[in-house]
Curated annotation (Swiss-Prot):
NCBIfam families: psbD (TIGR01152). It catalyses: 2 a plastoquinone + 4 hnu + 2 H2O = 2 a plastoquinol + O2. Chlorophyll a PD2 binds at residue 198. A plastoquinone binds at residues 215, 262. This is Photosystem II D2 protein. Its main location: plastid. It is a multi-pass membrane protein. It is found in: Plastid, Chloroplast thylakoid membrane. One of its GO terms (biological process) is photosynthetic electron transport in photosystem II. Chlorophyll a ChlzD2 binds at residue 118. The modification Phosphothreonine is found at residue 2. Fe cation binds at residues 215, 269. GO terms for cellular component: chloroplast thylakoid membrane; photosystem II.
Amino acid sequence: MTIALGRFTKEENDLFDIMDDWLRRDRFVFVGWSGLLLFPCAYFALGGWFTGTTFVTSWYTHGLASSYLEGCNFLTAAVSTPANSLAHSLLLLWGPEAQGDFTRWCQLGGLWTFVALHGAFGLIGFMLRQFELARSVQLRPYNAIAFSAPIAVFVSVFLIYPLGQSGWFFAPSFGVAAIFRFILFFQGFHNWTLNPFHMMGVAGVLGAALLCAIHGATVENTLFEDGDGANTFRAFNPTQAEETYSMVTANRFWSQIFGVAFSNKRWLHFFMLFVPVTGLWMSAIGVVGLALNLRAYDFVSQEIRAAEDPEFETFYTKNILLNEGIRAWMAAQDQPHENLIFPEEVLPRGNAL
Protein backbone atom coordinates (compact mmCIF):
# COMPACT_ATOMS: atom_id res chain seq x y z
CA MET A 1 0.00 0.00 0.00
CA THR A 2 1.30 3.43 -0.87
CA ILE A 3 0.84 6.38 1.49
CA ALA A 4 1.35 9.87 0.11
CA LEU A 5 2.58 12.47 2.59
CA GLY A 6 2.16 16.15 1.94
CA ARG A 7 0.30 19.26 2.90
CA PHE A 8 -2.25 21.51 1.36
CA THR A 9 -0.82 24.51 -0.42
CA LYS A 10 -2.32 27.93 0.06
CA GLU A 11 -2.66 30.58 -2.54
CA GLU A 12 0.38 32.80 -2.63
CA ASN A 13 -1.71 35.92 -2.14
CA ASP A 14 -3.72 34.64 0.82
CA LEU A 15 -5.18 37.72 2.56
CA PHE A 16 -4.42 36.45 6.07
CA ASP A 17 -0.77 35.82 5.21
CA ILE A 18 -0.44 39.28 3.67
CA MET A 19 -1.94 40.89 6.77
CA ASP A 20 0.16 38.74 9.10
CA ASP A 21 3.34 39.63 7.22
CA TRP A 22 2.59 43.36 7.32
CA LEU A 23 1.42 43.49 10.95
CA ARG A 24 4.30 41.46 12.38
CA ARG A 25 7.06 42.96 10.25
CA ASP A 26 10.19 44.11 12.07
CA ARG A 27 9.85 47.88 12.33
CA PHE A 28 10.67 50.66 14.80
CA VAL A 29 7.24 50.38 16.47
CA PHE A 30 5.88 46.84 16.40
CA VAL A 31 2.21 46.71 15.40
CA GLY A 32 1.12 43.07 15.46
CA TRP A 33 -2.40 41.70 15.62
CA SER A 34 -2.71 43.07 19.13
CA GLY A 35 -2.04 46.54 17.73
CA LEU A 36 -5.38 46.42 15.93
CA LEU A 37 -6.96 46.57 19.39
CA LEU A 38 -4.31 48.55 21.28
CA PHE A 39 -3.62 51.55 19.06
CA PRO A 40 -7.19 52.64 18.20
CA CYS A 41 -8.42 52.11 21.77
CA ALA A 42 -5.43 53.90 23.35
CA TYR A 43 -5.82 56.76 20.86
CA PHE A 44 -9.52 57.20 21.59
CA ALA A 45 -9.11 56.83 25.37
CA LEU A 46 -6.32 59.41 25.59
CA GLY A 47 -7.99 61.69 23.05
CA GLY A 48 -11.28 61.54 24.95
CA TRP A 49 -9.52 62.34 28.22
CA PHE A 50 -7.60 65.31 26.80
CA THR A 51 -10.78 66.60 25.14
CA GLY A 52 -12.84 66.25 28.32
CA THR A 53 -10.32 67.83 30.67
CA THR A 54 -9.79 70.73 28.27
CA PHE A 55 -13.34 71.64 27.24
CA VAL A 56 -16.12 69.67 28.97
CA THR A 57 -17.93 70.78 32.13
CA SER A 58 -19.32 68.55 34.90
CA TRP A 59 -22.01 71.06 35.79
CA TYR A 60 -24.84 68.89 34.47
CA THR A 61 -23.67 65.68 36.17
CA HIS A 62 -21.97 66.75 39.42
CA GLY A 63 -22.56 70.49 39.67
CA LEU A 64 -18.82 71.05 39.30
CA ALA A 65 -16.32 72.81 37.07
CA SER A 66 -13.89 70.23 35.71
CA SER A 67 -12.11 71.61 32.63
CA TYR A 68 -9.19 73.90 31.85
CA LEU A 69 -11.67 76.12 30.01
CA GLU A 70 -13.49 76.73 33.32
CA GLY A 71 -10.33 77.50 35.29
CA CYS A 72 -9.20 74.08 36.52
CA ASN A 73 -5.56 73.00 36.50
CA PHE A 74 -3.97 69.60 35.87
CA LEU A 75 -4.72 68.40 39.42
CA THR A 76 -8.37 69.49 39.48
CA ALA A 77 -9.52 68.85 35.89
CA ALA A 78 -11.35 65.59 35.21
CA VAL A 79 -13.60 63.64 32.88
CA SER A 80 -16.46 63.09 35.29
CA THR A 81 -18.91 60.21 35.52
CA PRO A 82 -22.46 60.44 34.12
CA ALA A 83 -25.35 61.51 36.32
CA ASN A 84 -26.84 58.90 38.66
CA SER A 85 -30.16 59.09 36.80
CA LEU A 86 -28.50 57.53 33.75
CA ALA A 87 -27.73 54.36 35.75
CA HIS A 88 -25.65 51.92 33.69
CA SER A 89 -26.41 53.27 30.23
CA LEU A 90 -23.52 52.91 27.79
CA LEU A 91 -24.31 56.47 26.71
CA LEU A 92 -23.61 55.84 23.04
CA LEU A 93 -23.44 59.01 20.97
CA TRP A 94 -26.25 57.70 18.76
CA GLY A 95 -28.25 56.34 21.71
CA PRO A 96 -31.61 57.57 23.02
CA GLU A 97 -29.99 59.93 25.56
CA ALA A 98 -27.80 62.05 23.26
CA GLN A 99 -29.52 61.23 19.92
CA GLY A 100 -26.42 62.11 17.94
CA ASP A 101 -25.95 65.53 19.54
CA PHE A 102 -22.24 65.71 20.47
CA THR A 103 -22.65 68.67 22.83
CA ARG A 104 -25.48 66.99 24.72
CA TRP A 105 -23.47 63.74 24.81
CA CYS A 106 -20.57 65.55 26.50
CA GLN A 107 -22.92 67.28 28.94
CA LEU A 108 -24.48 63.94 29.96
CA GLY A 109 -21.09 62.37 30.71
CA GLY A 110 -20.73 60.31 27.55
CA LEU A 111 -16.99 60.96 27.46
CA TRP A 112 -16.57 59.01 30.71
CA THR A 113 -18.01 55.76 29.35
CA PHE A 114 -16.09 56.39 26.12
CA VAL A 115 -12.76 56.76 27.97
CA ALA A 116 -13.45 53.94 30.45
CA LEU A 117 -14.38 51.30 27.86
CA HIS A 118 -11.70 52.25 25.34
CA GLY A 119 -9.18 52.45 28.18
CA ALA A 120 -10.06 48.95 29.40
CA PHE A 121 -9.72 47.45 25.93
CA GLY A 122 -6.53 49.45 25.34
CA LEU A 123 -4.96 47.93 28.47
CA ILE A 124 -6.06 44.46 27.36
CA GLY A 125 -4.54 45.17 23.94
CA PHE A 126 -1.24 46.13 25.61
CA MET A 127 -1.22 42.84 27.53
CA LEU A 128 -1.92 40.93 24.30
CA ARG A 129 0.94 42.88 22.68
CA GLN A 130 3.29 41.50 25.33
CA PHE A 131 1.97 37.98 24.72
CA GLU A 132 2.42 38.37 20.97
CA LEU A 133 5.96 39.74 21.15
CA ALA A 134 6.97 37.14 23.74
CA ARG A 135 5.74 34.39 21.42
CA SER A 136 7.53 35.95 18.44
CA VAL A 137 10.93 36.04 20.18
CA GLN A 138 10.32 32.79 22.12
CA LEU A 139 10.10 34.29 25.59
CA ARG A 140 7.92 33.14 28.45
CA PRO A 141 4.73 35.22 28.89
CA TYR A 142 5.38 36.45 32.44
CA ASN A 143 5.38 40.13 31.42
CA ALA A 144 1.84 39.79 30.14
CA ILE A 145 0.81 37.80 33.21
CA ALA A 146 2.23 40.52 35.46
CA PHE A 147 0.38 43.22 33.50
CA SER A 148 -2.89 41.41 34.21
CA ALA A 149 -2.68 42.84 37.75
CA PRO A 150 -3.14 46.54 36.88
CA ILE A 151 -5.80 45.52 34.35
CA ALA A 152 -7.67 43.67 37.11
CA VAL A 153 -7.50 46.77 39.34
CA PHE A 154 -8.69 49.09 36.55
CA VAL A 155 -11.60 46.85 35.56
CA SER A 156 -12.69 46.22 39.16
CA VAL A 157 -12.56 49.91 40.19
CA PHE A 158 -13.86 51.62 37.05
CA LEU A 159 -16.29 49.01 35.72
CA ILE A 160 -17.27 46.28 38.19
CA TYR A 161 -17.69 48.53 41.25
CA PRO A 162 -20.16 50.96 39.60
CA LEU A 163 -21.97 48.00 38.00
CA GLY A 164 -22.63 46.71 41.51
CA GLN A 165 -23.85 50.15 42.62
CA SER A 166 -26.73 52.17 41.19
CA GLY A 167 -24.84 53.57 38.21
CA TRP A 168 -21.61 54.79 36.61
CA PHE A 169 -22.01 57.89 38.81
CA PHE A 170 -20.29 56.08 41.70
CA ALA A 171 -17.17 55.15 39.69
CA PRO A 172 -14.09 57.39 39.93
CA SER A 173 -13.94 60.31 37.52
CA PHE A 174 -10.75 60.48 35.45
CA GLY A 175 -8.71 63.13 37.23
CA VAL A 176 -6.22 63.51 40.07
CA ALA A 177 -8.43 65.30 42.62
CA ALA A 178 -11.36 63.17 41.44
CA ILE A 179 -9.46 60.00 42.37
CA PHE A 180 -8.69 61.49 45.79
CA ARG A 181 -12.41 62.14 46.28
CA PHE A 182 -13.14 58.54 45.34
CA ILE A 183 -10.59 57.28 47.90
CA LEU A 184 -12.28 59.34 50.63
CA PHE A 185 -15.63 57.96 49.48
CA PHE A 186 -14.32 54.38 49.69
CA GLN A 187 -13.10 55.00 53.22
CA GLY A 188 -16.21 56.73 54.48
CA PHE A 189 -18.78 54.42 52.94
CA HIS A 190 -16.89 51.09 52.92
CA ASN A 191 -14.20 51.45 55.63
CA TRP A 192 -11.79 50.34 52.91
CA THR A 193 -8.59 50.65 54.97
CA LEU A 194 -9.83 47.96 57.36
CA ASN A 195 -10.64 45.58 54.52
CA PRO A 196 -8.26 42.57 54.49
CA PHE A 197 -7.98 42.67 50.69
CA HIS A 198 -6.82 46.28 50.86
CA MET A 199 -4.28 45.25 53.49
CA MET A 200 -2.94 42.55 51.16
CA GLY A 201 -2.77 45.08 48.34
CA VAL A 202 -0.78 47.55 50.44
CA ALA A 203 1.56 44.76 51.56
CA GLY A 204 2.06 43.74 47.92
CA VAL A 205 2.77 47.23 46.54
CA LEU A 206 4.98 48.43 49.40
CA GLY A 207 6.65 45.02 49.63
CA ALA A 208 7.43 45.19 45.91
CA ALA A 209 8.96 48.66 46.34
CA LEU A 210 11.13 47.32 49.15
CA LEU A 211 12.19 44.31 47.07
CA CYS A 212 13.07 46.56 44.12
CA ALA A 213 15.20 48.83 46.30
CA ILE A 214 16.99 45.89 47.95
CA HIS A 215 17.53 44.09 44.65
CA GLY A 216 18.86 47.15 42.82
CA ALA A 217 21.19 48.08 45.66
CA THR A 218 22.48 44.50 46.00
CA VAL A 219 23.28 44.19 42.30
CA GLU A 220 25.05 47.56 42.33
CA ASN A 221 26.99 46.53 45.44
CA THR A 222 28.24 43.25 43.96
CA LEU A 223 29.23 44.35 40.44
CA PHE A 224 32.51 42.90 39.22
CA GLU A 225 35.34 45.39 38.67
CA ASP A 226 36.28 44.17 35.22
CA GLY A 227 36.58 47.56 33.59
CA ASP A 228 38.51 50.77 34.21
CA GLY A 229 35.67 53.18 33.50
CA ALA A 230 34.91 56.03 35.88
CA ASN A 231 31.48 54.74 36.83
CA THR A 232 29.21 51.70 36.66
CA PHE A 233 27.97 52.42 33.15
CA ARG A 234 31.35 53.02 31.52
CA ALA A 235 33.03 49.98 33.02
CA PHE A 236 31.06 47.32 31.14
CA ASN A 237 30.41 46.30 27.60
CA PRO A 238 26.63 46.00 27.17
CA THR A 239 27.09 42.99 24.88
CA GLN A 240 29.41 40.98 27.15
CA ALA A 241 28.39 37.35 27.56
CA GLU A 242 29.23 36.85 31.22
CA GLU A 243 27.21 38.20 34.12
CA THR A 244 28.29 41.44 35.74
CA TYR A 245 27.59 40.80 39.41
CA SER A 246 28.26 38.11 41.98
CA MET A 247 25.24 36.14 43.19
CA VAL A 248 27.49 34.26 45.62
CA THR A 249 28.67 37.47 47.28
CA ALA A 250 25.11 38.76 47.50
CA ASN A 251 23.99 35.48 49.06
CA ARG A 252 26.74 35.66 51.69
CA PHE A 253 25.87 39.27 52.51
CA TRP A 254 22.13 38.71 53.06
CA SER A 255 22.73 35.44 54.85
CA GLN A 256 24.71 37.41 57.42
CA ILE A 257 22.12 40.21 57.57
CA PHE A 258 18.91 38.17 57.85
CA GLY A 259 20.14 34.63 58.40
CA VAL A 260 18.41 33.59 55.15
CA ALA A 261 18.89 34.64 51.53
CA PHE A 262 17.81 33.70 48.02
CA SER A 263 20.11 31.03 46.67
CA ASN A 264 19.19 31.27 42.98
CA LYS A 265 18.06 33.99 40.62
CA ARG A 266 14.94 32.23 39.38
CA TRP A 267 13.31 32.07 42.79
CA LEU A 268 14.44 35.61 43.62
CA HIS A 269 12.93 37.14 40.49
CA PHE A 270 9.79 35.03 40.65
CA PHE A 271 9.25 36.34 44.19
CA MET A 272 9.68 39.92 42.93
CA LEU A 273 7.00 39.13 40.32
CA PHE A 274 4.70 37.31 42.73
CA VAL A 275 4.52 39.93 45.50
CA PRO A 276 3.14 42.96 43.60
CA VAL A 277 0.98 40.94 41.19
CA THR A 278 -0.68 39.03 44.02
CA GLY A 279 -1.18 42.24 46.00
CA LEU A 280 -2.90 44.00 43.10
CA TRP A 281 -5.07 40.99 42.36
CA MET A 282 -6.14 40.84 46.02
CA SER A 283 -7.07 44.52 45.87
CA ALA A 284 -9.13 43.89 42.75
CA ILE A 285 -10.96 41.03 44.46
CA GLY A 286 -11.65 43.32 47.43
CA VAL A 287 -13.16 45.99 45.18
CA VAL A 288 -15.44 43.38 43.59
CA GLY A 289 -16.58 42.62 47.13
CA LEU A 290 -17.31 46.32 47.69
CA ALA A 291 -19.39 46.34 44.52
CA LEU A 292 -21.63 43.86 46.35
CA ASN A 293 -21.46 46.00 49.53
CA LEU A 294 -19.56 43.35 51.49
CA ARG A 295 -18.29 44.80 54.75
CA ALA A 296 -14.79 45.11 56.15
CA TYR A 297 -13.84 43.93 59.62
CA ASP A 298 -16.40 44.92 62.27
CA PHE A 299 -15.27 44.89 65.89
CA VAL A 300 -18.74 45.17 67.35
CA SER A 301 -17.67 44.48 70.93
CA GLN A 302 -15.46 47.59 70.88
CA GLU A 303 -18.27 49.70 69.44
CA ILE A 304 -20.71 48.52 72.12
CA ARG A 305 -18.25 49.17 74.92
CA ALA A 306 -17.39 52.61 73.52
CA ALA A 307 -21.10 53.45 73.41
CA GLU A 308 -21.56 52.35 77.03
CA ASP A 309 -18.33 53.77 78.48
CA PRO A 310 -17.41 57.35 77.50
CA GLU A 311 -13.85 56.79 78.74
CA PHE A 312 -13.26 53.78 76.48
CA GLU A 313 -12.01 54.54 72.98
CA THR A 314 -9.74 52.75 70.50
CA PHE A 315 -8.25 53.76 67.19
CA TYR A 316 -10.94 51.55 65.62
CA THR A 317 -13.84 53.37 67.29
CA LYS A 318 -12.28 56.74 66.41
CA ASN A 319 -12.05 55.66 62.76
CA ILE A 320 -15.69 54.53 62.78
CA LEU A 321 -16.70 58.01 63.99
CA LEU A 322 -14.50 59.59 61.31
CA ASN A 323 -16.24 57.46 58.68
CA GLU A 324 -19.61 58.67 59.95
CA GLY A 325 -18.34 62.22 59.60
CA ILE A 326 -17.19 61.58 56.04
CA ARG A 327 -20.60 60.18 55.15
CA ALA A 328 -22.51 63.03 56.78
CA TRP A 329 -20.42 65.76 55.16
CA MET A 330 -19.80 64.04 51.83
CA ALA A 331 -23.20 62.61 50.92
CA ALA A 332 -24.91 65.98 50.58
CA GLN A 333 -21.98 67.46 48.63
CA ASP A 334 -21.27 64.40 46.52
CA GLN A 335 -24.85 63.44 45.63
CA PRO A 336 -26.67 66.75 45.08
CA HIS A 337 -29.41 64.96 43.13
CA GLU A 338 -30.57 63.26 46.34
CA ASN A 339 -31.30 66.62 48.05
CA LEU A 340 -29.93 65.25 51.32
CA ILE A 341 -30.33 67.57 54.31
CA PHE A 342 -28.69 66.71 57.63
CA PRO A 343 -29.77 68.67 60.74
CA GLU A 344 -26.96 70.64 62.34
CA GLU A 345 -27.02 68.52 65.48
CA VAL A 346 -26.07 65.31 63.64
CA LEU A 347 -23.05 66.78 61.87
CA PRO A 348 -19.71 65.92 63.51
CA ARG A 349 -17.94 68.60 65.51
CA GLY A 350 -14.42 69.01 66.82
CA ASN A 351 -13.73 68.62 70.54
CA ALA A 352 -13.38 72.38 70.95
CA LEU A 353 -17.02 72.86 69.92
